[in-house]
C-alpha cells in the first residue's frame, strides 16, 4: 500500500485538474500560473530554468506586494463535494512562500459566484512554512462548489489539494438514464485496495481515458499466492448493467484476468467493509484481459439488483487504467 500522510488523503482530490478544476479569477500570478496549483503530479524543481518573468516555479506565485492587501484566487472545483481536509503544499518555495493562508467556501448550483454570494470561512488563517506540506482537517458539513484561497500577503504555493466526497444532485437523473455510478464526478470513491505501489487506486474513477501508465492503479509484482483487489463505493445505489475495464497504457503489466463482486451495504466503517467484501456476490465472473485495451462486459453481468459497493479483483496483479460501472439509479 502507498503510505498516506493523513487519513483524509484517501478521499478524492476535488481540486484535481483532471476533474476540471480551474481558477476563475486571481489577483496576481505574475511569476507562476495559478492553475499549476491543481496538477495531479507532485511539484518539481527545474534548476536554472527562467522565463520572461523570472525563475520558473511549479505552482502559483504572485509578485512582491508593495501596497496594502493580500492575494487570492477564486477556484471552481472540478466536482462539488463535502471537504474532509486540505493540503497546502509549498514544495520548493523557500524564500518566497506566504507566511499564512486561509480558505473560504461557497456553493453555487449553476455558474460561478457573484458579488452577492455569501462566503464561509472553512479554514482560518494558518501559518505556513517553506518547502512543506500543511495538512488541515476541515469541519464543514455542507457541499462546496467554489473556494477562495487567500495568501497573506503574497508569495508562492506549489499545490492545493482538497480531499472530500463528491456531490451530485441525483434528483436530476432520469429513472431510465444509464450513468457511470462509479465515476468520481458522480461521487464514486475508492475505499481500500490490496496494494497501490505504482499508482493510486482513486485514478481508476477519473474522467476520460488515462493520460499515461501513471494515471491508473498499478500494484507491485505479487510474489505470494493470491490476487490484488480494490473496493469502490458507488456515488449512488443502482443496478449495474454494463462494465468497462480499461487497461490503456498497461502492456507488459496488465492483469491476466479480472472479476467483480458487489453488495448493498447499509452500514459499517471502511475497514469493516473491506472484511465483508470477501463474501460479496459475484457480479462479473472471471474474464480474460488484454493489454492496452477497453474491455466491455454486459451479457456476462449477473442481475443482483441494487448495489452500493463493488470489489474489482485482478489476477494475479498488474495495472488498470479505468473502471466504469454503468447502470440505473435506484431511488
UniProtKB/Swiss-Prot annotation:
EC number per UniProt: 3.5.3.4
Top-level taxon in the UniProt lineage: Bacteria
Keyword Ligase included in the entry's annotation: no
Pathway: Nitrogen metabolism; (S)-allantoin degradation; (S)-ureidoglycolate from allantoate (aminidohydrolase route): step 1/1
Reactions mediated catalytically: allantoate + H2O = (S)-ureidoglycolate + urea
Pfam families: Allantoicase
Enzyme class: hydrolase
Disulfide bond annotation, renumbered to this chain: none
Keyword terms: Hydrolase, Purine metabolism
An example molecular function term from Gene Ontology annotations: allantoicase activity
Family: Belongs to the allantoicase family.
Official protein name in the record: Probable allantoicase
Native source species: Stutzerimonas stutzeri (strain A1501)
Amino acid at each position: 500500500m502507498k503510505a498516506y500522510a493523513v487519513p483524509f488523503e484517501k478521499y478524492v482530490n476535488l481540486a484535481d485538474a483532471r476533474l476540471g478544476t480551474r481558477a476563475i479569477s486571481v489577483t496576481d500570478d505574475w511569476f507562476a500560473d495559478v492553475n499549476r496549483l491543481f496538477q495531479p503530479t507532485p511539484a518539481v524543481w527545474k534548476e536554472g530554468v527562467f522565463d520572461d518573468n523570472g525563475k520558473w516555479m511549479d505552482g502559483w506565485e504572485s509578485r512582491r506586494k508593495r501596497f496594502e492587501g493580500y492575494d487570492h484566487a477564486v477556484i471552481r472545483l472540478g466536482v462539488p463535494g463535502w471537504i474532509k481536509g486540505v493540503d497546502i503544499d509549498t514544495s520548493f518555495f523557500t524564500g518566497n512562500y506566504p507566511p499564512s493562508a486561509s480558505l473560504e467556501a461557497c456553493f453555487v448550483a449553476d455558474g460561478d459566484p457573484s458579488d452577492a454570494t455569501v462566503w464561509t470561512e472553512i479554514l482560518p488563517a494558518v501559518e505556513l512554512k517553506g518547502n512543506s506540506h500543511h495538512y488541515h482537517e476541515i469541519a464543514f458539513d455542507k457541499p462546496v462548489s467554489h473556494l477562495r484561497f487567500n495568501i497573506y500577503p503574497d508569495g508562492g504555493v506549489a499545490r492545493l489539494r482538497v480531499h472530500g466526497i463528491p456531490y451530485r444532485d441525483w434528483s436530476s437523473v432520469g429513472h431510465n438514464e444509464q450513468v457511470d455510478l462509479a465515476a468520481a464526478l458522480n461521487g464514486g470513491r475508492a475505499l481500500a485496495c490490496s496494494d497501490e505501489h505504482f499508482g493510486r487506486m482513486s485514478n481508476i474513477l477519473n474522467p476520460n481515458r488515462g493520460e499515461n501508465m501513471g494515471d491508473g492503479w498499478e500494484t507491485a509484482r505479487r510474489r505470494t499466492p493470491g490476487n490484488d483487489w480494490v473496493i469502490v463505493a458507488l456515488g449512488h445505489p443502482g443496478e449495474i448493467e454494463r462494465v468497462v475495464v480499461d487497461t490503456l497504457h498497461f502492456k507488459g503489466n496488465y492483469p491476466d484476468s479480472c472479476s467483480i463482486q458487489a453488495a448493498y451495504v447499509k452500514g459499517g466503517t471502511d475497514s469493516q467493509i473491506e472484511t465483508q467484501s470477501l463474501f460479496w456476490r459475484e457480479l462479473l465472473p472471471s474474464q480474460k484481459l488484454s493489454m492496452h485495451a477497453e474491455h466491455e462486459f454486459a451479457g456476462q453481468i449477473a442481475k443482483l439488483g441494487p448495489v452500493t459497493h463493488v470489489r474489482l479483483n485482478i489476477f494475479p496483479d498488474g495495472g488498470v487504467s479505468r473502471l466504469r460501472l454503468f447502470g440505473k439509479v435506484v431511488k
